[in-house]
Amino acid sequence: MPVCEQVAFAGGNGKLAGRLFLPDSGSDATDPVAAVLVAGTWTSVKEQMADRYAEELARRGFAALSFDFTGYGESEGVPRDYESAALKIRDLRGAADFLGGHPAVAGTGLGVLGVCAGAMYASAFAAEDSRVRSLALVAPWLHDRRICDENYGGPEGVEAKKAAAAAARHQYEETGEVAYVPVVSGSDPDAAMPFDIDFYLNPGRGGIEQWPNRYAVMAWTEWLDFDAIALAPRLTAPTLLVHSEGAAIPDGARRFHAALAGASEFLWTEGGQFDFYDQPRQVAFAADATAEHFARTL
C-alpha cells in the first residue's frame, strides 16, 4: 500500500498544503524513486482528483505529489478560489523545488501529470522548466481563443465575461471584496459551468466540503486569454495524451498534439470528461498509461 505524507512547502504566494504518496520502497530513503507532480483541474482541491491519481501512481512505483494551489483548500493565499494560470505555474515550480529536496525522490528528472485544465498549467510549467523530463495529460482541456469562442458564447460571450472580470477586479482593488459565481450550477447562467454536473454536486464524488463551489469573476480574463495550443511547439519533453471523443474539447487535444515539438503518444479511450476524475475504468486506464509513459521516460 502507498505511504501518504502530509507535507507543506512554499508556493507562489504563501505556504501550500500537499500529500506526498510513496510506494512501499519509496518510503526508504536509501531507495529513491522517480517523482511526479499531479495538477488537478481548474477550481479543484486535491481531494477531488489529484489525490486519486497521485495514489495510483504511487501504487505503480512513483513518488507522486498532489497539493492545493494557492488560495484553494488547505493552502494559504488570498484572494480565495481565484483561478490564475500564472500563479498556478509558480506553485508547480515550488512543488518541484520541494520534491527535488525530498530524500525519497531520485534525481533523475521530474514527471508532471495534468488532469483536465491542469493539463494547461502542467504544459506551461514543462515548457519553461528543464527539470520536467516527462509530461502526461489526462482528459486534457487545452484551449485557445478559437475554442473559447466556441464554448463561451462566441466573441460576444467572451467579451462579456471579460467585461464582468474587469468590473470585479475594480471592485476588489477598491474594496477588497471578491465577486463570486458558482463553479457549477444549472440554475445560474453566470456560473463558470452553467450545468448540473453530478461529479461536482454529488457529495459521494467531487461535491465535497473542502470545495466551496465558487469562482472569482475577476479570473475570467486570464482564463480566456490563456493559449494552451501555442505551448505545444515549445515542449520538448516526451508527452502522452489520454483522451476520449466523449470528453471535453477533443479538437483542442488533437491540435495540441499535432503541434508538439518532441516525442509524443496519443491514446484514445472511452468515457465522459468527469469519468476520468473518479470512475474506476477510466482512472485505471489513465493511471496505467501514464505510469508506463513515466517508466519509459524518467
Which residues does each predicted region cover?
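N-terminal cap/lid segment of alpha/beta-hydrolase-fold proteins
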Residues: M1-D31
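Conserved alpha/beta-hydrolase
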Residues: E56-E76
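Short beta-strand/loop motif that positions the catalytic acidic residue
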Residues: L235, L241-H243
